[in-house]
Curated annotation (Swiss-Prot):
PANTHER family: ARGININE--TRNA LIGASE, CYTOPLASMIC, ARGINYL-TRNA SYNTHETASE. A motif ('HIGH' region) lies at residues 131-141. Belongs to the class-I aminoacyl-tRNA synthetase family. Monomer. It is an enzyme of class 6 (ligase). It is found in: Cytoplasm. SMART domains: Arg_tRNA_synt_N, DALR_1. This is Arginine--tRNA ligase. One of its GO terms (molecular function) is arginine-tRNA ligase activity. One of its GO terms (biological process) is arginyl-tRNA aminoacylation. The gene is argS.
Amino acid sequence: MNIFKNFEKKIKKSIELSDIKGKNGEDLDLSKITVDPPRDSSHGHLSTNAAMVLAKSIGLSPRALADKIIELLKNDISIENIDVAGPGFINIKLTKLFWQDAVKYMLELGLSYGRIPMGQGKRINVEYVSANPTGPMHVGHCRGAVVGDVLSNLLQFAGYNITKEYYINDAGQQIEVLAHSVLLRYREALGQKINEIPEGLYPGEYLIPLGQALAQEFGDQLLTMDRDEALSIVKERAIHTMMSMIREDLAALNIYHDIFFSERMLYADNARAIRNTINDLTLNGYIYKGKLPPPKGQNIEDWEPSEQTLFRSTNVGDDQDRVLIKSDGSYTYFAADVAYFRDKFNRHFDEMIYILGADHAGYVKRLEAMAKAISGNKAKLSVFLCQLVKLFRNGQPVRMSKRAGSFVTLRDVVEEVGRDPVRFMMLYRKCEAPLDFDFAKVTEQSKDNPIFYVQYANARCHSVFRQAQEVLHIESFSNDILITYLHRLIDDNEILLIRKLSEYPRIIEQAVVHKEPHRLAFYLYDLASCFHTHWNKGSENLNLRFIQPHDKELSFARLGLIQAVINILSSGLSIIGVEAPIEMR
């Protein structure tokens, strides 16, 4: 139950059934009416802009129209007080009975509270991570991995049928470089002295065990056999080993994809998938032979003046046409990307989501263009770019050097601070904004550490039930007992906490609509803060403590409120993919 949406519908219905019409008696456009929490909680529980957005079309001042709308709503039994504020906002205060019933509804639904059936089984493909299989995942991959995984969980929670996909870039030049790098480590394992890793090869020590494994399996056979045959063997072993490493890295973050799609599949059978894609585009007038002008402000060495096979992507919104087949007959990386999108589209997803690194910003237009061309403008596509993660330790930057092969791996971070802090903190900024990750901050036990603060709220809630068992001499508390006495929840602090709990379905809906999982992390922190504030007031005022030894009914009512907090914290943390601990020491 999204109380904000419910009241929005109620206000719209009241206006539709009233004599409030446009200047010429026409029906009004009510689509811009919203109901939200007021910015200042002292102004009421709900606030609507109805009078502000309709006044001009009616020919009244917003305040005058607000008075008319108030007349329509004032007899609603759930409303305690309704008035107009400022230029014409309508503020609504709801009855205590309404909020007590809201807790009852939360307890009846349990962990399903907030689960709005928005998706209705629609199929969405979410592609995320898709790191090159050339080494272990580093911290730069971490943010997109978490954002993609939590967004997938969020969409599933809202009723969508989600496919989590990883595209393995295993057919490009980087795989050639990987194979030569592994061969170097193989020779090293056989006893050859390698003074320095040549420029352009991967210098990381993570390839040493693979070189040793090849030496153990093949001895020196790879040195004597045909070089292409040897490279083919090394490629297969290297890709398999790197992908196993990547899967283990992702598993450390509790991330598991449904599909791992190999780029090499697109090149199978003489690149049939790519050829078919280009044939389709040709039939629709998107392919021509031509020359592209030299790129402005870029390295002219990468420009080819010869005639090539081009995709007329400017016809579908791109800023320049794209090469699909070079003059030597080889396919570009982009040709494989287009074929991959065609494969996805032919799997009949209702929407395709790409989670990419910020370095792919220039790729978005061509991705949108290929989607329009392949689908005839029918594909629904969403692209999200994740900005960089900067590592700190006690406020000091952590230095890394790609050239030297020294970088902080995803596994390093998870092993040092734990999975939960990594997952939660990667969401604690909008993905479009850079994120600072401080190893010290994410492990400290304070309000300044969001994941600790949220999990501690859940643990505190469970401690209240343990205390209740001892003080009230009751082994377990059924929903029926907790619901029976909710009418005792009348304190303003309790109502404030209920109001925050009631925002959960709205937050879920907004996070799904905008595809912004960080909204959920922010909300859980705010809910935890609201709970901790209420807890602390019990230290100052014994009457506000959750357990009242001489008043079982009030204790049961407050335990019902605590159970609602537990349910929503557990639900939200489950979507984010972190634990909801019942005890913390």
